[in-house]
Curated annotation (Swiss-Prot):
Reported function: Component of the ubiquinol-cytochrome c reductase complex (complex III or cytochrome b-c1 complex) that is part of the mitochondrial respiratory chain. The b-c1 complex mediates electron transfer from ubiquinol to cytochrome c. Contributes to the generation of a proton gradient across the mitochondrial membrane that is then used for ATP synthesis.
Any Pfam family matching the protein: Cytochrom_B_C
CDD domains: cytochrome_b_C, Cytochrome_b_N
Lineage of origin: Eukaryota, Metazoa, Chordata, Craniata, Vertebrata
Binding-site list for heme b b566: H98, H197
Extra remark beyond the main annotation: Heme 1 (or BL or b562) is low-potential and absorbs at about 562 nm, and heme 2 (or BH or b566) is high-potential and absorbs at about 566 nm.
Name used for this protein in its record: Cytochrome b
Cofactor(s) the protein needs: heme b
Primary localization class, coarse: mitochondrion
Gene: MT-CYB
GO function terms (MF aspect): metal ion binding; ubiquinol-cytochrome-c reductase activity
Subunit structure: The cytochrome bc1 complex contains 11 subunits: 3 respiratory subunits (MT-CYB, CYC1 and UQCRFS1), 2 core proteins (UQCRC1 and UQCRC2) and 6 low-molecular weight proteins (UQCRH/QCR6, UQCRB/QCR7, UQCRQ/QCR8, UQCR10/QCR9, UQCR11/QCR10 and a cleavage product of UQCRFS1). This cytochrome bc1 complex then forms a dimer.
Family: Belongs to the cytochrome b family.
Entry binding sites for a ubiquinone: H202
Gene Ontology biological-process entries: mitochondrial electron transport, ubiquinol to cytochrome c
Length: 380
């Protein structure tokens, strides 16, 4: 009998073991769709990004008009740009839901997979930030100025570090050039990291909604979950294309339709919606270095998730206290996102401070306590 090519060929074998004959728990829900959706997001962003890069000029005098030229004169340039800009939003929606799923079902106990995932999140945030600077509108310029300036809070080396990153004494042409280089490079690094993420995942196999070992009940990935993933793609592409075609600027900032002007500061400097929760945490601390540390901690705290797991059960499926805390945390993140979009005045300052305190308290203190308490409840 001739050997099956997809099982014997060195390259096809890799694809086969990852996407076709992969043993998958039979009971994974739609929450497990977001990994493949993130892969599709990445491919879409790389494709639209490459097409945009062919028409973009990384120069302060030409960047803004080159983007306008792409939208006006290039065949379907407006569509490519709208898909790329809104695709970033969908990328973040998917990654936040993916992380939320991992948190709820205890997937962070696969430590290597979880840690590479957090590094992926940081890489994605860096990519989105440098990408937002490229159109060289007002919010691009001032966003770059404000966020890069945060590094000056680092004692002793801060100011030198910022000027080194800028390539001068302010955000200018060298900054734009290197940000374009970084924005081009990082997605390919993300793709590489995603492969490492998958390699670690396939070492242990997928978790499932019950948080228990599922070796006794696995089914092949194809056709069951490949088909389910295609449904997921359709469900994601519908709102993405709807947004890109009907209301492409809904999530953007009107300030960015004005070319960058170092002499005029916008009334409210704020990042895109997907960074607002972290921005709110940054602003809630009146000290510069303290704010920067809190901003870093807001994402880096995810690395501690495996260490703070005190429950005997993996998933939160049968843990009511942890469930309550989880959904409180989700609501709290919405509040932080909203506060981040508001001006720095009463009552938003105090709301932001309380929400920031709640965020860290739930993650670092209440989750371990709830886990230990639920262990006690198992005895009754």
């Amino acid at each position: 009998m001739a050997p099956n090519l997809r099982k014997s060929h060195p390259l096809l074998k890799l694809i086969n073991n990852s996407l076709i004959d992969l043993p998958t728990p039979s009971n994974i829900s739609a929450w497990w769709n977001f990994g493949s959706l993130l892969g599709i997001c990445l491919l879409t962003q790389i494709l639209t990004g490459l097409l945009l890069a062919t028409h973009y000029t990384a120069d302060t005098t030409l960047a803004f008009s080159s983007v306008a030229h792409t939208c006006r004169n290039v065949q379907y340039g407006w569509l490519i740009r709208n898909l790329h800009a809104n695709g970033a939003s969908f990328f973040f929606i998917c990654i936040y839901l993916h992380i939320g799923r991992g948190f709820y079902y205890g997937s962070y106990l696969n430590k290597e997979t979880w840690n590479t995932g957090v590094i992926l999140l940081l890489a994605l945030m860096a990519t989105a930030f440098v990408g937002y600077v490229l159109p060289w509108g007002q919010m691009s310029f001032w966003g770059a100025t404000v966020i890069t300036n945060l590094f000056s809070a680092i004692p002793y080396i801060g100011q030198t570090l910022v000027e080194w990153a800028w390539g001068g004494f302010s955000v200018d042409n060298p900054t734009l050039t290197r940000f374009f280089a970084l924005h081009f490079l990082l997605p390919f690094m993300i793709a590489g990291l995603a492969l490492i993420h998958l390699t670690f995942l396939h070492e242990s196999g997928s978790n499932n909604p019950l948080g228990i070992l599922s070796n006794c009940d696995k089914i092949p990935f194809h056709p069951y979950f490949s088909l389910k993933d295609i449904l997921g793609f359709i469900i994601m592409f519908l709102p993405l294309t709807t947004l890109a075609l009907f209301s492409p600027n809904l999530l953007g900032d009107p300030e960015n339709f004005t070319p960058a002007n170092p002499l005029v500061t916008p009334p409210h400097i704020k990042p895109e919606w997907y960074f607002l929760f972290a921005y709110a945490i940054l602003r809630s601390i009146p000290n510069k270095l303290g704010g920067v540390l809190a901003l870093a901690a807001s994402v880096l705290v995810l690395f501690l998730a495996p260490l703070l797991h005190k429950s005997k059960q993996r998933a939160m499926t049968f843990r009511p206290f942890s469930q309550f805390l989880f959904w409180t945390l989700a609501a709290n993140l919405f509040i932080l996102t909203w506060v981040g979009s508001q001006p720095v005045e009463h009552p938003f300052i105090i709301i932001g401070q309380l929400a920031s305190l709640t965020y860290f308290t739930i993650l670092l203190l209440l989750f371990p306590i709830a886990g230990a308490l639920e262990n006690k409840m198992l005895n009754y």
